[in-house]
Amino acid sequence: MQVLVRDNNVDQALKALKKKMQREGIFREMKLRGHYEKPSEKRAREKAEAIRRARKLARKKMQREGLLPMKPKPVVGVR
């Protein structure tokens, strides 16, 4: 992965690198590979993730159909 440093602005380059790594899922991968995960634990984690995704999808569908109230959007920039 490569990030350009412009005008010796290393902070901005680091921020861009972190953003790229986050998008690629590198941090999550590092966290998962940080220690050995037993196959049974891996199956349980993946099953829980699938259930979470299905619930989220169902919730969004219910909101679109008007059966659940929409989540209020946060107000940005009001002081």
From Swiss-Prot:
GO CC term (a single one): ribosome
Keywords: Ribonucleoprotein, Ribosomal protein
Listed Pfam families: Ribosomal_S21
MF terms in GO: structural constituent of ribosome
InterPro entries the record matches: Ribosomal_bS21 (IPR001911), Ribosomal_bS21_CS (IPR018278), Ribosomal_bS21_sf (IPR038380)
Region described as Disordered: 59-79
GO biological process: translation
Record family assignment: Belongs to the bacterial ribosomal protein bS21 family.
Entries under HAMAP family matching the protein: Ribosomal_bS21
NCBIfam families hit by this protein: S21p (TIGR00030)
The protein's name in its UniProt record: Small ribosomal subunit protein bS21
Species in which this protein is naturally found: Methylocella silvestris (strain DSM 15510 / CIP 108128 / LMG 27833 / NCIMB 13906 / BL2)
Top-level taxonomy: Bacteria, Pseudomonadati, Pseudomonadota, Alphaproteobacteria, Hyphomicrobiales
The gene coding this protein: rpsU
